[in-house]
Amino acid sequence: MQAPYLHKGNLSLGERRGPMNYYAAKELADSFRTVRKNTLLIAQDIPQEKYAFRAAPDTRSVGELLAHIASACTLQYQLHAVERRSSLEGFDLPSFIKRVLAEETQPRSKDQILEMLRGSGEKWAGFVEGLTDDFLAEQVQMPPGTTPPSKSRFEMILGVKEHEMHHRGQLMLIERLFGIVPHMTREMQSRLAAAAAKS
């Protein structure tokens, strides 16, 4: 069955929902909070003195990458919460991105970055969990020449979590370079060891 937020027919959202397992605002917010919680645990595991480390030239440092993650919902928050845009036509995306990137690169301590992650994460999740089904189903027109020409708000909002998980994978590899076993791997190893001990 086609996902309700991607359906472009004339049925109402309730009519087109059908017997599927429904994934709505509460689930979006809960899953984002889980992702952000794990990002915070990685940020806590990496020592302050490693926050300036860059895995390669012309890449973000650990601290900059974490600040980027903390800021990643800024664009979608502006589009959906502040302006509630139905089209990106006329939106000055380059200037907005430039301002966000400048904010990301401000010098910060580890504690400041952790607080930034906590604050932005809860602000975003708090917004998402209050959204209606109809709002999530709305289509937003992309800039002219973009493929696809429109996206549902659901897809755009879900993209915030996908973006964070992409960068979290980079951080987990960087942890390995520092000799740190990522916490999710440690937890899995512990579960496997406990299961083996019972067999």
Regions found by a protein language model. Give the residues of each.
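N-terminal amphipathic/basic-hydrophobic helices that include classical n-h-c signal peptides
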Residues: 1-19
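Short, helix-capping/interhelical loops that line the mouth of catalytic, cofactor-
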Residues: 15-27, 71-149, 178-199
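Alpha-helical transition-metal enzyme core signature, strongest for iron centers
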Residues: 32-39, 62-77, 107, 114-124, ...
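Membrane-proximal, proline-rich intrinsically disordered regions
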Residues: 46-48
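Surface-exposed patches in mature extracellular/periplasmic domains of secreted proteins
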Residues: 53-54
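Conserved functional hotspot residues or short segments at active or partner-binding sites
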Residues: 58
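Short alpha-helical transmembrane interface motifs in multi-pass membrane proteins
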Residues: 153-155
